[in-house]
């Protein structure tokens, strides 16, 4: 799995859209989560979808759009319609945290990641099962390992050395975190979690341990 992480927009919808396009097109994330709680991504996606289909972008209106666009269209125009609809569907890969206090749990095989806007709201129940703790509220991009846990934040979307992060599961089951700068370059990348292969049981003095 490849999970994109997009930092808060800081009232900059233009840059937010550019970073969302980067996550979808360049990083090819399976899904992406916006870590702000200002509703900015909802607004960006709404306008983006409307721009693509030049009308009501809802699923329920797809047949109406098809009738209007394709009834007397050329093959080239039909291909353009289908391309726009595919892109509209792709926008569903962009998600938001449900609300300011919400936690979202993501599973990479046996690795648990908890996503939240403000890490100050993390409690013991959040931290115990999690190997990766992702948060949005941060002035700087962060990859910081403490023991077996990693704290990760992409930082604001306008940050020159961050704004976007990617959690990617590798072939060996390790999870790698990468930070991407505003120019699309990799700023930092490291393995932040390894799969739990299960505890080994040994017997010493007749007692299992």
Please tell me what each predicted stretch does.
Residues 11-21, 152-209:
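Binuclear metal-dependent phosphoesterase catalytic core
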Residues 28, 86-88, 108-111, 148, ...:
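Short, solvent-exposed coil/turn segments at beta-strand boundaries
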Residues 16, 44-46, 126, 145-146, ...:
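Short, well-ordered secondary-structure micro-motifs
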Residues 1-53, 66-69, 86-94, 100-102, ...:
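N-terminal active-site segment of His-dependent metallophosphoesterases
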Residues 52-60:
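Acidic, Ser/Thr-rich peripheral helices and adjacent loops at domain boundaries
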Residues 79-129:
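Active-site-proximal segments of metal-dependent phosphoesterases and phosphodiesterases across multiple
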Residues 116-178:
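Conserved beta-sheet core of the metallophosphoesterase superfamily
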Residues 5-8, 31-38, 65-66, 73-82, ...:
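Active-site neighborhood of phospho(di)ester-bond hydrolases with catalytic His/Asp-centered motifs
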């Amino acid at each position: 799995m490849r999970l994109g992480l997009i930092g808060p927009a800081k009232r900059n919808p233009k840059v937010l859209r550019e970073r969302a396009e980067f996550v979808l097109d360049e990083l090819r994330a399976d899904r992406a989560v916006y870590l702000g709680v200002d509703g900015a991504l909802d607004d960006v996606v709404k306008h983006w979808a409307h721009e693509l289909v030049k009308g009501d972008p809802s699923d329920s209106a797809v047949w109406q759009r098809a009738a209007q666009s394709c009834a007397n269209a050329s093959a080239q125009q039909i291909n353009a319609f289908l391309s726009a609809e595919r892109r509209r569907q792709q926008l569903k890969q962009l998600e938001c945290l449900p609300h300011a206090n919400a936690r979202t749990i993501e599973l990479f095989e046996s690795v648990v990641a908890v996503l939240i806007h403000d890490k100050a709201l993390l409690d013991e129940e959040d931290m115990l099962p999690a190997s990766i703790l992702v948060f949005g509220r941060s002035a700087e991009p962060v990859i910081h390992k403490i023991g077996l846990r990693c704290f990760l934040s992409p930082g604001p979307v306008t940050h020159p050395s961050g704004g976007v992060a990617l959690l990617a599961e590798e072939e060996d089951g390790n999870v790698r975190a990468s930070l991407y700068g505003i120019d699309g370059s990799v700023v930092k990348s490291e393995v932040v979690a390894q799969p739990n292969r299960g505890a080994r049981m040994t017997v010493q003095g007749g007692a299992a341990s």
